[in-house]
Structures are given as C-alpha cells and as structure tokens.
From Swiss-Prot:
Residues 175-218, 236-330 are annotated as: Disordered. The lineage of its organism: Bacteria, Pseudomonadati, Campylobacterota, Epsilonproteobacteria, Campylobacterales. ATP binds at G552, S553, G554, K555, S556, V557. GO terms for biological process: cell division; chromosome segregation. One of its GO terms (molecular function) is ATP binding. This is DNA translocase FtsK. Residues 186-213, 269-282 have a biased composition (Basic and acidic residues). Consists of an N-terminal domain, which is sufficient for the localization to the septal ring and is required for cell division, followed by a linker domain, and a C-terminal domain, which forms the translocation motor involved in chromosome segregation. The C-terminal domain can be further subdivided into alpha, beta and gamma subdomains. The alpha and beta subdomains multimerise to produce a hexameric ring, contain the nucleotide binding motif and form the DNA pump. Residues 532-722 form the FtsK domain. SMART domains: Ftsk_gamma.
C-alpha cells in the first residue's frame, strides 16, 4: 500500500505542475514569457473555450484535487458530482456562445441544436443544465427548491381562473368543497327555483319571441313529446306543449306535500283536464312526433311534482263532462303515483337519518383513527392468570389499603384536538422522508400516547426505526419509542410522551378488581399499561424476575411495589423473604418484619452463604416431595395436614444489586443463583434480581438463560437494552417508573408504568405488620464464620488446600485459572489459594514467564 500511495502522490504533483504551467500560458501567452508552446496553447485554449479559457484549467485542477482526496473515486456519489461539474461547464459554454459568440465548442453545439429547438429551446436547455448542476453539487432535494414556488403558482392560477369565470359568467359561483345533495342543499335549491318561477311570472312574455323548439337549428329532441290530436290521452304519457299559455292566473305557492294530506285539493284528473282546455291547438308544423315511451317508475315522483307546479295556474273555464272509463284510469294512475311518492319519501327520510356526520376531509388521514381503550394482547395475558376467592388467614390480619394515601387522579390524556395535531405533524414529517402511510389506531394513557402507523407496501420498516430522533424533534418530545414491527400486526407503534404525566399510585392498583380477585399468593402489582388499565402478573408463572435500570429510572420504586404487593397477599407463615442489599439502604425500611427468614444481608460474603443455604433448602424440599410422591409445592401443602408435616412457605430471594455481588463473589455467586433458577420453581423458591448495570459480565449467559422473565426500566445504551431484553427500546424510556416487561409465553414487550408508594406509606405498612407478630429468624440460614467460604486459608489442614496440592501434583499445572476450573471456585479464591501455597513453600514465586514451579511433594 505504501508504494501505491507514493505513486499516486507523484502523479498528482506532475499533473498539478502541468496544469499550473498551462494556466500561466493561458494568462500570459501573448507576453512571450512561456515560449512558443505557451503562446500556441493559449491561442488554442481561447479558440475552443473563449473567455472561459482563463478559468477552465484552475477549475479542472480543483476537481482533480477533490478526486485525489477521495479514497474510492468510482463510487456513485463521486460520479454524480463529476456529472454536476460537467453540466455546469457545458451550460457556461452554451451561455457564452449564445451571448458573446465565443468558443468553438459552444458555437458548434449551438449551431447543431438551433434548427431543432430554436433560440428559446437553447435558453431553456441552458437553464435546465444550470439547475440540475446546482442541485447535484449542493445536494438539495428538488422538493425543497420547487415545491414552495409550485404551490404559490398553482394558487395564483386558480385565483385568476375563478376571476375570469366570474367576469365572463354572471351566474358562476365557486363550488364549495364537501358533500352535495344534503337535505339543506335540496331545500335551498327548491327555494331558488321557486323564486325564479315567480320572476318569470312577473315579466310579460314577448309574443314575437320564439321558443327554442320553434327554431329549426335550436330544436332539441324530447323523448316525452307526443302528438296532440283529437284522440284520447294515453295512459302513462306526459303531454308537453311548445306554446306557453297567454292567459293564466297566479295562485299562492303551495307545499309540494299538501296533495298527500289535504283532501280539499282538486284531484289530478281535474288539473289535467283544465290544463288541456287552456292550451291552444298546435299546428302540425310545431309538433314533433315521437314514439311513445312508458314512464320509468323512478321518474314518476319527479314528473308528478312538475305537473303540480304547472297545474297551479288554472284558467276560469267551465268543466267538461268526462268519460267514466277515463276517470277510473286516471284514479288508478293517481293512486299509484301517490304510493310511489310516499315510498320515495320514506326512503329519503331513512337515508337522511342514517347519514353519518361528515367533517371536512383533511389531507393527512383518509379515515379518523380509532381510539382504543383496552389492549387485546394485554387482556389475553391477564386472562391467563388464576382468579378466585382467597382464604383469609385466621390469626393474622392482612394490611388494608387505608394505610396508603388517598388517590388524587388528574386526567393527563390528550384531547382529540391535540391528538389530531400530533397525527398531522407525524404524517407530514414522515412524508418528508418519503414514508407514506396512515394512522389507524391511537392509545392514550397516563404517560404516553401510542399511534399505530400502517406504512405503504413499498416502505421498509428499517427506515422508520431510524427516525426516532427526527420525530422527537418535530413533536417537541423528550424521547420517542418506535416498535417496529408489532408482532401479529401490519403496523408500526410510535409512542409519544404526553405533555403532562400522571402519577400512578400503588393504592389504585391494589384496590383494582384484578388484584382483589387474583387467587395466586404471589401476585405482583406491576402498574398500568399504556391505556391506563391496571396490570398484574403471577410470580409462580414467571417464575423468576430479572430487573435492570439506571439511577433515577424508577427501579427501586418498582421493586418496592412488588414487595408490598406480596405483603398484602401473604401472612408470615405462608411467605418468607431473603433480602440481599449490598447498598445497605434500599431494604433497611423492611428490617425485622416477620416475613424475613434472615436479617437483611448487606455483606456480599454472607450473601453467597445465604444463597448456598437456599440451594440446600431446595434440595431438602425436593427430597421430602419425592418421599410423598408429589411434584409441586401446592400438592405437597394440600397433603401436609393428612401426612402430619408442616407446609412449605414460599421462599423468595430479593437481590437489589447483582453487579456488586458478581464483582465480589464471581462464580461463587453465579452458580447458586443459576441452580435456584433452574430447579426452584416446583419447590416454591423464586428469585427477584435487580441490577443497575446490565452488562455481559454481570448478567452472564447462565443467569440470563435461567431468568426468562425480565423487566427493564430506562438504561443508558442500546447495548444494555439488548443484554436485558434481547432488543433495543429500553434506552428510550422516560424514567420515573416507565418500564418494559417480557411476560412468559408472550410475543413482544409490554410497556407499563410502575406504581409509586412513598416512604411514609411503606413505614405505615411495616409498622402494621410488626405490631401483629415478631420476627423469628431461621438458624440454619445464619451461617457462622467457620461455615463461610474461605477467602484466605491460613492453616495447613484445610481440605481445599490439600485438594489443590493433589490436583497440582497430578496434572503438573500451577496456574490460577487451572485451579479455578478444577476446584470449581471463583478466580479470587483460586488466586488466594495459590498465594497461600507459595507462602507455605509448596510453589515458587513467578518467574520471568509468569509460571510457578513445584518445590515439594506430600
């Protein structure tokens, strides 16, 4: 690679010197300072490039320098920029040729193109080349350049078009956007038609004026015209006269439905007869014979209304006697038409009643999104829990919710206007990145509002995941979590925090119907979901829980809520707790409650001993369960009274900081935790393990495999989120109890908000419990110093030292890691044993290579 770089540098220097000489020749060619070659090159350059000959070579040198700085000059971006520079030079050559008639290259191209596109086409081509070059070189999207001007131009042309129509068409009225033929529009049209008819009645008709049908070139064929002769009118036909009546009487305007309700109105046959009598006899020239056509049933109501309007003008002529057959036929026609009118009126009324309330169509969403009040996936998880009546303890009173503060709720969910505005901002921002789609559902809760976005079929989900920061900036949100895709759905979940968050109280969850009816004694109150409904889980079905969260994420609040929910469900003889608190302050408030099996453990060494004691208790329980041939703790406790043995209480180990325990004990802490997690479920042993640092060295593969159910509050990085949840998203949580939960057997994550309980409330509950019963610690779990794992063996007769010597003499290997693997102990203890063997003279100090030699045998 080094020779290649040197060759590239030498080539660049040679080209640079050559271009510098040619540039000076173009500038100083006529002075003779650059010799004959310089004079010749200057004339040649000016001949082909005109006035651009003074800048074309420096411009070329600059472009070549940019290519030299690029590692790979054949990428798409570099070729695109090269095309931009080339188009810019060509446009300048064309422009120079058109304006100054300079440069052979521009003149040749101009003379070639002029016969085809003319001068106007040349200027348009130059403008197009300049614009494309500008967009390529400055990386501007065409939308940001043209769209503002296109919108303004479009609006201006629309306004000019409307003004022209108004100027040349007096009856023009701009169309209103919306839905036509509503009941109000029909009423307005009828009122307008009535006014026009009254105006026509007031103006006298010019007798010399001819109707359009009388002019040969204006005659319009009418399908309902019929021949007017002395024959009787045919049934089902309408007679239309081309001559308006010269004598008529104006009657007051009537309601079009009066004929159906008022029996005093003249019948239809009288109106038809009077209309026929007042019409003059037409000539043969004015008649247009047509083939009689039957009236369609759907047109009957319309024609009837028109006949009523025409027949309101009745002349004062005596009535003629009519044939009884004609009267019978006309009565039948009248009855049939009235029935059709009534049926159509009923249909119109039903359509008007069933018509939805239309709102103006917005360009953001074709359909208004559905507001969801309950999540189906959460309901399915909650339905899988056990519910029923819970037996109250006989000699113990469970704490009441009256010990907790009263719930003071305030509605912090977004209103519809704010949700619509967020939807509009969200869709407009997505469309700027060419991501089309629509919002189909929304979930509004106490902390966040979730929008389910259905992208277009051509949109990749990975493109949406990378827009969380851009969307957060657009919506002025603290952080946005994008869940893509949601398993089992064709949508992407976009969770946006509310402007005001609601405090979720523990009392509200404990008083909920879900918690009260849950029959499991290990029910945990996790909080509320994203729509504000309470959410609980059963620790027996988890069966262990791994919790992670940074400082201020609400991890301690969530753990306290779980402990309090266990204390609200269980008396001391049914539940025992082992609390490990390396920080010495988190669990100190629970000191000396009767549910504790040991005092609160703050020393990591004693914590490892307690975990080993729990593992031994697990083995003891399994041996007894095997003796009585039962598989679970529930079956054993049911048979305990008949077998004359004591029932097993549930034993829960709560570890506040796993990182400190792993740092101190290492494998000694990891093995008992993994062993309890693997086998403790059936014997009633469960783990709740919390940590602030979910790194790989803390949450090892062995622990992670055996703790499938996890809760993650806000963490620092995506890597921490993937360690605890196997996916990212926890880094985008809001803190203050906002968490993600992986329920057993469910696909995906559940976002929850942990309930809050103050220290005063916890003290009240603890005092209430301690007032009923005193604590009794189990001596088997209180390990003495002699039974603790040794970190500094200091005597010759120690078994572990003898085992270490035997292994070293057998394998002839003295490394610390070898002892760790063979003795199955932690690295720190193995290093301590090695140092002790060196102090006893069994091993030599490390040599230059870091190895030790065996100095003595048994």
């Amino acid at each position: 690679m080094q020779p290649m770089k040197s060759k590239k540098l030498y080539l660049a220097l040679i080209i640079g010197v050559l271009l510098a000489f040619l540039t000076l020749s173009s500038w100083l060619g006529n002075s003779g300072l650059v010799g004959r070659f310089g004079v010749w090159f200057a004339a040649l350059n000016k001949k082909y490039f005109g006035h651009l000959s003074f800048i074309n070579l420096p411009y070329l040198a600059w472009v070549l320098f940019l290519l030299y700085k690029t590692k790979n000059p054949f990428t798409e971006i570099v070729l695109e920029k090269t095309l931009g520079h080339l188009l810019g030079i060509l446009s300048l050559l064309f422009l120079q040729s058109s304006l100054l008639n300079q440069g052979e290259i521009g003149n040749s191209a101009r003379l070639f193109l002029r016969p085809f596109i003319g001068d106007f086409g040349l200027y348009a081509l130059i403008t197009l080349m300049v614009v494309i070059s500008y967009l390529i070189l400055f990386k501007l999207p065409p939308k940001s350049v043209f769209y503002p001007y296109m919108n303004k131009t479009q609006n201006l042309l629309k306004e000019i078009y409307k003004q022209c129509l108004q100027a040349f068409s007096p009856n023009f009225s701009p169309k209103k956007e919306g839905f036509e033929n509503t009941p109000s529009d029909i009423q307005k049209k009828e009122t307008k038609n009535d006014k026009e008819k009254e105006n026509r009645k007031e103006n006298p008709i010019n007798e010399n004026h001819k109707t359009p049908n009388e002019e040969p070139f204006l005659a319009i064929p009418t399908p309902y015209n019929t021949t007017l002769n002395d024959s009787e009118p045919q049934e089902g036909l309408v007679q239309i006269s081309s001559h308006p009546p010269t004598h008529y009487t104006i009657y007051p305007k009537r309601n079009r439905f009066d004929d159906l309700t008022n029996p005093t109105n003249p019948p239809l046959k009288e109106i038809k007869q009077e209309t026929k009598e007042r019409e003059p006899t037409p000539t043969k020239e004015t008649l247009t014979p047509t083939t009689p056509k039957p009236i369609m049933p759907t047109l009957a109501p319309i024609i009837e209304n028109d006949n009523k309007t025409e027949n309101q003008k009745t002349p004062n002529h005596p009535k003629k006697e009519e044939n009884p057959q004609e009267n019978t036929q006309e009565e039948m026609i009248e009855g049939r038409i009235e029935e059709m009118i009534k049926e159509n009126l009923k249909k119109e009324e039903k359509e008007v009643q069933n018509a939805p309330n239309f709102s103006p169509v917005t360009p953001t969403s074709a359909k208004k999104p559905v507001m969801v009040k309950e999540l189906s996936e959460n309901k399915e998880i909650l339905d899988g829990l056990d519910y029923g009546e819970v037996q109250k303890p006989k000699d113990y009173e469970l704490p009441t919710t009256q010990l907790l503060n009263a719930v003071c709720l305030k509605d912090t969910s977004l209103d519809e206007n704010e949700i619509d505005q967020k939807i509009q901002d969200l869709l407009s921002k997505l469309r700027t990145f060419k991501i089309d789609g629509d919002i189909i559902r929304t979930y509004s809760g106490p902390i966040v509002t979730t929008f389910e976005f259905r992208p277009a079929p051509n949109v990749k989900v990975s493109r949406i995941l990378g827009l969380s920061d851009d969307l957060a900036m657009t919506l002025c949100a603290e952080s946005i979590r994008i869940q893509a895709p949601i398993k089992g759905k064709d949508v992407v979940g976009i969770e946006i925090p509310n402007s005001q968050s609601q405090i979720i109280y523990l009392r509200e969850i404990l008083e909920s119907e879900l918690f009260q009816k849950s029959s499991s004694p290990l029910t945990l109150a996790l909080g509320k979901d994203i729509v504000g409904n309470p959410f609980i889980t059963d620790l027996k079905k988890l069966p262990h829980l791994l919790i992670a969260g940074t400082t201020g994420s609400g991890k301690s609040v969530g753990v306290n809520a779980m402990i309090l929910s266990l204390l609200y469900k269980n008396p001391p003889d049914q539940l025992k707790l082992v609390m490990i608190d390396p920080k010495m302050v988190e669990f100190s408030i629970y000191a000396d409650i009767p549910h504790l099996l040991t005092p609160i453990i703050t020393d990591p060494k004693k914590a490892i001993g307690a975990l080993q004691s729990v593992a031994k208790e697990m083995e003891r329980r399994y041996s007894l369960m095997s003796e009585y041939k039962v598989k679970t703790i529930d079956s054993y406790n049911e048979q305990a009274p008949s077998n004359g043995v004591e029932a097993f209480p549930y034993l829960i180990v709560v570890i506040d900081e796993l990182a400190d325990l792993m740092m101190t004990g290492g494998k000694e802490a990891e093995f008992p935790i993994a062993r309890i997690a693997q086998m403790g479920r059936a014997s009633g042993l469960h783990l709740i393990v919390a940590t602030q640092r979910p790194s790989v060295d803390v949450v090892t593969g062995l622990i992670k495999t055996n703790l499938p159910s996890r809760v993650s509050f806000r963490v620092g990085t995506k890597i921490d989120s993937k360690v605890i949840l196997d996916t990212d998203g926890a880094q985008s949580l809001l803190g203050r109890g906002d968490m993600l939960f992986t329920p057993p057997g469910a696909n995906g994550l559940v976002r929850l908000h942990a309930p809050f309980a103050t220290e005063d409330e916890i003290k009240k509950i603890v005092d209430f419990i301690k007032a009923q019963k005193e604590v009794q610690y189990d001596k088997d779990f209180l390990l003495e110093e002699s039974r603790m794992p040794l970190d500094t063996p200091n005597y010759q007769g120690d078994d572990i030292l003898e085992r270490a010597k035997a292994v070293i003499l057998e394998k002839k290997i003295t490394s610390t890691s070898f002892l760790q693997r063979q003795l199955k102990i932690g690295y720190n203890q193995a290093a301590t044993i090695t140092d002790e063997l060196e102090a006893q003279g069994f091993l030599s100090p490390r040599n230059a290579k870091g190895n030790r030699e065996i100095l003595q045998n048994f």
